[in-house]
């Protein structure tokens, strides 16, 4: 592994060329000790590539650097290893290697990416959390990028449901970005994994985020966009997903809402529409992934009154007055039912007398 770590450190040698080395049977160790004249037999190397390799070999201490890396307690895998995610092997420009803290996604389980706007609405926040939680209860892994907004909401929804979630970073795996997500970062390490193709210690840079998006989509079976503006980075993830042959789904939105522009545009391009979370989860869940459906889960917890009130709520706040006109209960009784739903975690009161679903 120490020679693979050296090859990974040559960041100016592209992933594509590292993959070609692998395909040609040229291991990292063989490259490290290859005579200078034989480097010219590797026709896809440029003179600059050969210069990078020769200069690195002259100054790089393989043993020392590998020992220093091992002290960081970070996992490391390359496309030459069996543990490398199979879903990434055949995408365009697969990362030669991955660093991770925690674990890599379980190859035997489905994964869904949930991404979207950083400056999301309260509605988008709730949808992302509820969707992630619903999928997690069916044993589906959640992939996202730990950015502010929808990414964070998706991770939180999964964790709150006891699921496994994985964050692909635009920095080194040992660099928490944004810093305010430190609590989330630590929780993901314990319940899933932090993943990056970048060398440990790498600070986040703007150019790294589009690069990591191809890994988010690549690790996933399905990509869901919750909210996205016209130039949202999550649309890059959607483009990668379509290029990789993955299904893309969106949460539809109001045509007057700038946060809906990206999703509505994807609908125009043929993306799937999530109009009911329970049905979406049911449709994509394969036999063997679930012990019970979402509706069964709720029926086991809610009584008839609670189920009725819950069915009338959405992820947009509804006033108590509007709600009272739709149920055959006195206002005092309705308040009691809502309070019970809040205690059970199914409903939130966003502002006094306005309620939304939280599950």
Describe these PLM feature segments.
Residues 1-126, 130-137:
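Short, positively charged patches
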Residues 78-359:
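Glycine-biased, small-residue-rich flexible motifs in mid-sequence functional cores and linkers
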